[in-house]
Amino acid sequence: MDKLLERFLNYVSLDTQSKAGVRQVPSTEGQWKLLHLLKEQLEEMGLINVTLSEKGTLMATLPANVPGNIPAIGFISHVDTSPDCSGKNVNPQIVENYRGGDIALGIGDEVLSPVMFPVLHQLLGQTLITTDGKTLLGADDKAGIAEIMTALAVLQQKNIPHGDIRVAFTPDEEVGKGAKHFDVDAFDARWAYTVDGGGVGELEFENFNAASVNIKIVGNNVHPGTAKGVMVNALSLAARIHAEVPADESPEMTEGYEGFYHLASMKGTVDRADMHYIIRDFDRKQFEARKRKMMEIAKKVGKGLHPDCYIELVIEDSYYNMREKVVEHPHIIDIAQQAMRDCDIEPELKPIRGGTDGAQLSFMGLPCPNLFTGGYNYHGKHEFVTLEGMEKAVQVIVRIAELTAQRKS
């Protein structure tokens, strides 16, 4: 495990922040740098069929070291970091034997406090890797990458029995494009696991059904002094639309299996306003009902408008709950749970209040639940990971490979 931390620190030193609204994939040059580094490292380790596609998907195979018809399985992580917070000049702090209390992040006023993040109370005595308060850390998902790379090394060095192990590193997961250019046939695994979760023990195979809603509102602007009966204020229409959206079904009011409507952005003038919502729900019927609700609201608010003024609503599905695909193959979850228990970890099955590459891949024919990385507070300057959590993730990956080798196709 001595190289696990070294690998992680190496990977987070590269700025791989992805960028939304960009046609090219990967969306940023920094992602290519990490992909080329990983390709070189995989080749040096002796993996075969190492390929890097023109869309930035890196794949490789660790060949089986035992005979028999053992199913090929995969492990997947993404190279990009969130657009929500800078990933440039990441300067990790290593806090050994955490004794509790606030951790100063760099030389400013930022702290990592157990008052705000009570999970710290459970991590006494562990080694924490934090930010310096100026950037995110990049544990999402460079912890996953380091864990997969280290697990490959452990399987080789200890000659642990395993079948074919496929690995893949994808770009632009944070902007929803990670799986769009993933060649499932070329990957050629029976099932896979993304290593992109949170705290130790998390095992996730349920995620939101997701859709985006874009609303274009065209009004009519005239001088306010002569506006009666003529002006149609697009901003007022936008306000009326949002007032119709259930206020108690927003992200800040929901948790667990509860879905939500989220107004992510709004801009405009009297003439023209644009609103962008995201809709999330675990239940497919409720998901469809939420989309209908948005259409009904737009129709209600737009009723009776002058023909030159209108409300246009476009709904686009983003991804679906992988549960309906993964539950068709219960052994995938059973093996992961057994692997965790064999590593003295109690599995924590919980829904992902978000999405992963695995959600899309599951609907592309590759069932793909999500394993923990040992990281917390992703997408911001309070992000951190524990070295012990990362070590546990490596152990679980290795044990999954070992258990799968005991299972014949």
Curated annotation (Swiss-Prot):
The record's GO CC annotations read: cytosol
**Subcellular location field:** Cytoplasm
The record places the active site at: D80, E173
Query: What is written in the cofactor note of this entry?
Result: Binds 2 Zn(2+) ions per subunit.
- Kindly state which reaction or reactions the protein catalyses: Release of the N-terminal residue from a tripeptide
Which terms does the UniProt entry file under GO BP? Answer: peptide catabolic process; proteolysis
Q: Which prosthetic group or cofactor does it need? A: Zn(2+)
- Protein name, as recorded: Peptidase T
Q: Which gene encodes it?
A: pepT
